[in-house]
């Protein structure tokens, strides 16, 4: 749920019991780490007076060492704080929250269960407004990267743009739209970036996903003589088993703070949003790739309607889901079959889309639906979940009901964990 909340609001938090809660939530924290979501995991830790006493506490595995839990969190968080006294609590907590927001990763904060009841002079002060210093690009590196990229793309005959999932953590979606408007290139997104670029954009050609791309999208991307990928992740899922027909020498890869151009130079300390915004002012307008797409594109036919007593087919179901979508909707797709079916949905302006492609933990969507709906009550959340995944986290439905949420869940019996 904290994962879904962070997707809607920019940061999420969860509070759990020491060890039994911490190790239970570890899987969800790992998922948030993989998706670059700032999430604050707060643990009610042992009484500060129990440290160093060799006592064995409940909710542990019977060891006198209380460091087991923070060690488990080491590889799925960017910072861990164990608060055992009030003297440095302020500094540790501020550092943890700041690091989560700067790194866009989860952090772990364990607070001794006796500390909240102890008075301290700092509690009487007015809280200081929280602020972070903005990150800045190296201006010389930025200028050099933009100049090299503009030269690379302006000499291409049919260049394209492809948006990737790291545009979210880079806060570069608006800059990517600005670049798309300026250059006129055909624009695709990777599957895990669906929802980060407006699908009503005049030059949007769909999802680039190798052999399972949107119709005619792969042909345009893979036949281009230059492509710019903004924030890509090339894992076995997104590359369809590393089968993408791309050539490194044709690619500009833009990561949140680094730009690599073909087989040539790489430019560090260059923020993605600064680079894309500056590049938009340097590119020549070139709609060739989009015009090629427009020539070969054939609209998909609509499936035949089901007879009243006929079994409901998936393609007919998703035609009805498509008709339900509006700018006030958010689609949440579960791992498995729902990924592929939801990728085919055409998102109207303002419609959100979320799924967990990197980590792919079944059952993720139920909790994410709960958290997202709580964070964005003005949105109608539509979740598509397979029955196998639903069994893992179905208990979150009770919390949805308690909170009065108006989520729509399509529970799809697909015959297994697919």
From Swiss-Prot:
InterPro entries listed in its UniProt record: DHS-like_NAD/FAD-binding_dom, PDC/IPDC-like, THDP-binding, Thiamin_PyroP_enz_cen_dom, Thiamin_PyroP_enz_TPP-bd_dom, TPP_enzyme_TPP-bd, TPP_PYR_PDC_IPDC-like
rRNA processing listed as a keyword: no
Induction: Anaerobically.
GO cellular component, one term: cytosol
Keywords of the record: Decarboxylase, Lyase, Magnesium, Metal-binding, Thiamine pyrophosphate
Residues bound to substrate: 59
Gene Ontology biological-process entries: aromatic amino acid family catabolic process to alcohol via Ehrlich pathway
Binding site for Mg(2+): 387, 414, 416
The protein's required cofactors: a metal cation; thiamine diphosphate
Record's catalysed reaction(s): a 2-oxocarboxylate + H(+) = an aldehyde + CO2
Cofactor stoichiometry and binding remark: Binds 1 metal ion per subunit. Binds 1 thiamine pyrophosphate per subunit.
Tissue specificity note: Leaves.
SUPFAM superfamilies linked: DHS-like NAD/FAD-binding domain (SSF52467), Thiamin diphosphate-binding fold (THDP-binding) (SSF52518)
Enzyme's top EC category: lyase
EC number(s) per entry: 4.1.1.1
One Pfam short name: TPP_enzyme_N
Region feature (Thiamine pyrophosphate binding): 337-418
GO molecular function: magnesium ion binding; pyruvate decarboxylase activity; thiamine pyrophosphate binding
Subunit-level organization: Homotetramer.
Family: Belongs to the TPP enzyme family.
Name of the protein this chain belongs to: Pyruvate decarboxylase 1
Species of the source: Nicotiana tabacum (Common tobacco)
Gene name for this UniProt entry: PDC1
